[in-house]
Amino acid sequence: MKNLLRAINPLNRPQTERLDERQVRNNAGGFVYTVSDESRLTRFLVLGVDGGTFYASAQKHTVQATDFVRELVQRDAALALRVTLDVVRGQRAPKADPALLVLALIAKTAPNAADRKAAWDALPEVARTGTMLLHFLAFADALGGWGRLTRRGVANVYETADVDKLALWAVKYKARDGWSQADALRKAHPKTDDAARNAVLKFMVDGVLPKVDSPALRVIEGHLKATEAQTDAAAAALMQEYRLPLEAVPTHVRGAEVYRAAMQTNGLTWLLRNLGNLGRVGVLTPNDSATVQAVIERLTDPAALKRGRIHPLDALKARLVYAQGQGVRGKGTWLPVPRVVDALEEAFTLAFGNVQPANTRHLLALDVSGSMTCGDVAGVPGLTPNMAAAAMSLIALRTEPDALTMGFAEQFRPLGITPRDTLESAMQKAQSMSFGGTDCAQPILWAAQERLDVDTFVVYTDNETWAGQVHPTVALDQYAQKMGRAPKLIVVGLTATEFSIADPQRRDMLDVVGFDAAAPNVMTAFARGEV
């Protein structure tokens, strides 16, 4: 009798045993839930698959994710396109490549012709730059030939894009991934009666600019003059006169004056990626207070961040690279300016938008188990899930007036992270506490044991739980019964797998994607009971 009771009692079910028939085994051997198709695709679009995980190599992780996307496109291409466009329009993802791959799969392989056409119609919106278009073409070409729909879809981009935008592509994005603008034009054969547009397209193909009087062609005219520049000063003057991007200037004259001019002629994305180069050539230094102040004002301007489509991960990556004083590949060194490092931290927070507090009692639980120290989040070199969890938790910790941050693996212990911590100190604290296997029930069990009043549990994890004797969903029910309150559980997934400890059928549990720019406000609304 006792054995039978034990067998059916969920309180006696460890995480290595299935709690119900909806659970599946994760990569660590524990049983969890699978997220919905929409949630899994969103994870792929936001987090990508670069770097693998502790339990799955980069290659296996990539194959699993891309196989899922392929299968979803065959089964419900309309859903795949809707989710992709939602992420793109909301500026929720740090990289465009996952969205470009999904769009290429729909455009080339969707069973329904209407879905394929819809994907091609969306191409100008998703491939916003010349680089993105060439990346898309590399994906699309690998999936099939150049039929009528493909030729028409690519031609449409060149026929409808603003001429000044095309002219910028002609000098800034000449070739990527084995594809050039000339290659695309020779295959697509766009047609137009617009003389300025035809002039740009001809220049893309053969490098010759016809004599057409149009302001849109000035960037190409300036580029042609810059190719003849013999000095840094001459090239810098042309950049300012013609508003040239850095790529329009030959590499042998890219000295300090050219980089100083580039600060005025290039956007915020360029600035984030080139802070180290600005320091390397002597433009951004502690002694140049005017330049430092100008950089800080741009980095901390909320409107400029939104206008420049700066994702929080862009700012975090820039901070990680710039603060270490040398490039990711070891090329070039510089002296980081502390005020610029602080501005990048502020930019990280501002890039999430105006996050409102839920004003509920939050327990922020960071998974610091061994698996969280492996792999790179969203392809950012050196940004482990462990560090990403600490960075994400700081947003909630600085927003919510009543929040506590703890770390868990097989046990639960304080991390000492406070709202006053910098990104670096918070990530260091999380890294220094890394230990043991993963038991995602620990935060809830600890709160019940300590009789701590919690309205919202937020668990930052890779969902590879396996080491506990109680499933997290059961622990939440036990807590509610013991404390006489109905808490909510938010799971912030930091790897692009299909797993979650949150039961998708329960209204008191929510699974969100780590580093989704929309995540903090969605979490607030859920904690308030608004969704």
UniProtKB/Swiss-Prot annotation:
The source's domain of life comes to Bacteria
Chain spans, region RNA-binding: 128-274
Annotated GO CC locations: cytoplasm; ribonucleoprotein complex
Q: Where in the cell is it found?
A: Cytoplasm
> Which key words tag this protein in UniProt?
Cytoplasm, Metal-binding, Ribonucleoprotein, RNA-binding
| Major localization listed first in the record, in broad terms | cytoplasm
Keyword Nuclease set for record? no
Record carries keyword Metal-binding: yes
Quaternary structure note: Forms oligomers upon binding DrY RNA, The multimers are of an average size of 700 kDa and are composed of around 12 molecules of Rsr-DrY RNA.
Entry-linked PANTHER family: 60 KDA RIBONUCLEOPROTEIN SSA/RO, RNA-BINDING PROTEIN RO60
| Domain-level remarks | The horseshoe-shaped TROVE domain is built with 7 helical HEAT-like repeats, and is closed by the VWFA-like domain giving rise to a ring-shaped monomer. Single-stranded RNA is bound in the positively charged central cavity.
Extract the NCBIfam families matched here: RNA-bind_Rsr (NF041674)
Stated name of the protein = RNA-binding protein RO60
